[in-house]
From Swiss-Prot:
GO terms for cellular component: extracellular region. It comes from the Eukaryota. Negative results: does not show antimicrobial activity against E.coli and S.aureus and does not produce appreciable hemolysis on human erythrocytes. This is Phospholipase A2 homolog. Monomer. Residues 1-16 form the signal peptide. Keywords: Disulfide bond, Myotoxin, Secreted, Signal, Toxin.
Length: 138
């Protein structure tokens, strides 16, 4: 089942290290990334057009912007390590890129937790064609 979840998330287009990001999201929100966030709104799971639908979707927009600031890194493939201390995610200091990718993923997981009250099931599996126009600048 876990392998199926990982493959499904990867195919849908979640960026970053799928395993680590997925664990962070589960730990912070209590929600499984698939299906909760893999195609939520206009920015969670890809797409990246139009305006974020709510604060949850905005978390994914900001996450995409964070990755955009790492042009010399490979956030889709670089795996990193982190641990939790006193309920907080601590990114390990392996390489500069891996640490910065981890910090981007940590930020989105915390943002999703802080905005759980805005999560709206009507934006799960939101049709990408409804996301029109250029996104705002990061």
């Amino acid at each position: 089942m876990r392998a199926l979840w990982i493959v499904a998330v990867w195919l849908i287009g979640v960026e970053g290290s799928v395993v680590e990001l997925g664990k962070m999201i589960i730990q912070e929100t209590g929600k499984s990334p698939f299906p909760s966030y893999t195609s939520y709104g206009c920015f969670c799971g890809g797409g990246e057009k139009g305006t974020p639908k709510d604060a949850t979707d905005r978390c994914c927009f900001v996450h995409s912007c964070c990755y955009d600031k790492l042009p010399d890194c490979s956030p889709k493939t670089d795996r990193y390590k982190y641990q939790r201390e006193n309920g907080e995610i601590i990114c390990e200091n392996s390489t500069s890129c891996k640490k910065r990718i981890c910090e981007c993923d940590k930020a989105v997981a915390v943002c999703l937790r802080e905005n759980l009250q805005t999560y709206n099931k009507k934006y799960t599996y939101y049709p990408n064609f409804l996301c029109k126009g250029e996104p705002e600048k990061c």
